[in-house]
Amino acid sequence: MLFFTSCFNGSRELEVPKSKHIYINSISSASSTELRVKAGITIPLIGANGNSENDIELSAHHNSTPIVVKKDGASFIIKLDRELNANDEISLIATSEGIPSISTVARVLGAPKLLRAKGEWVHFDEGSSRVQVKLSIEPTKEVAYYRLIVRSKWYSESLGVSPGTLLERKIVTLGNPLFPQQKDQLFNEVNNAPFALLSLKNESDVTFSYYDVKLENSPDAPVKMDWEYSAEVELQRISKDYYLYLLTCMDSENNNAFENPIKIHSNIIGGFGIFEIYTPLTTPILIK
């Protein structure tokens, strides 16, 4: 694997590595008792030989207490005996013979406090509608960083579509366009889906909208369908490092790498990648 982004504990300009380095990518929820850590070795453009991903050794600590790490292919599995709480820390050290060791720490932040989420259908045109949502969050004294995800679904018992049907993630547009929505497609191979980023301080109300299809019975329809609608918002409290990582990944997607140097933020000391444990909170959107 060739890496064309240099991420040594911060942002640097585009650079093809002249020597091998360890990279780590791990994004997990604090509500999980299993952390999966992807690890590998960057390969110089010329003279690639020697170490493979199988040569990496990983050690982990939970609040300075060693924890068991198991190898699973190119990944490592860390089993925890409980869910993580605010201010818990997980630290990692990865080594491989002849390559500089790397280290990183993820600290769990307090869960966001959602006060309410109210939505309203505000526009529909040719089958495409929009839901305007006002999200009220308990303000924080310091700057807080969030990733916002919206899911929705239609269901009908008479048509055999149960309330348990999985919700579909929606494209989110912020009312105050802080940042455009993007797709989480770097280092997230399974759940390619839209999200929005927020940075807030002493603010409690966030306005955003998302597009959906509004199913309505025609007044002259002989049979009325019992469609029901459900939507929810997931607010993830994330670290400043992960926030900057996502922003710089967005920039690298939107810019021409051969015209503008790519800068990808990292919290891996001595290597590449990101280590993040976010704190999620999901609440239903009450829609008129």
Q: What is the role of each PLM region?
A:
Residues 1-6:
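Sec-dependent bacterial lipoprotein signal peptides
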Residues 7-288:
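A sequence/structural signal for flexible, mid-protein segments enriched
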